[in-house]
Amino acid sequence: MTDTQTLTFAEVDAAGLDDWRQLFEALRTRFLTGDFATGLDLVARIGALAEEANHHPDVDLRYPHVNVTLFSHDVFGVTARDVDLARAISTAAAELGVSADPTATAVVEVALDTWDHTEIKPFWAAVLGMVDSPESDRAVFDPSGAMPALWFQRTERHDEPRQRFHLDVRVPPEVAESRIADALAAGGTLVSDEHAPRFVVLADAQGNKACVTTGLGRE
């Protein structure tokens, strides 16, 4: 097995990584550090291990815990590199007396029903500032991991229903104009700019709405 070969869910499960869970394309866990200083210490140790392995996880430091996400960006999946580094990180945490709670991890994705994802995917990539998923042509994602992925669920063509929820995208004020322009250029339409600059309502070619919002005009 090469270190660029993606592992199946069963192979990852067989590796016995008790501190970790595989969710989608990544290994994830939460280390219960209890305070900021211990969290900083653990993050420093994770950083040293990552540099030594030349393999770098995503690390989210909070006051009572540290979230860690591991996957091989070059193949967009879990490889032996991730398994090895996960074991090393667990050892470092144990040396600090820090336990893991992998059951606290979760990943939220947003699914949009559509009869033709190719018609609306460019709009959603533009309005959300995302890119095409390397895993599927039916999804867009945020490479930074800051926002949940959006994927397009196949459905039969139907009349436009009354929309019960929509996505609001809050951006810095200086970004809003270009974000709106990109969304319109990608096949979107302007529904309303009555409340600009607080928010502008856009829609994709099938009538699904999104708002580009800023902090301006909310005093």
Task: List the predicted regions and their residue ranges.
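Amphipathic alpha-helical segments
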Residues: D35, L40-I46, E119-M130, A183-L184
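N-terminal beta-strand motif that seeds the catalytic metal site of vicinal oxygen chelate
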Residues: A94, V98-E119, G217-E219
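Vicinal oxygen chelate
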Residues: F71-H73, G77-A80, P102, V107-W115, E135-T155, D159-E177, V200-A203, ...
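Core segments of cupin and vicinal oxygen chelate
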Residues: T114-A149, R179
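A common structural junction motif
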Residues: G47-H56, I89-L96, L128-V131, A185-V191
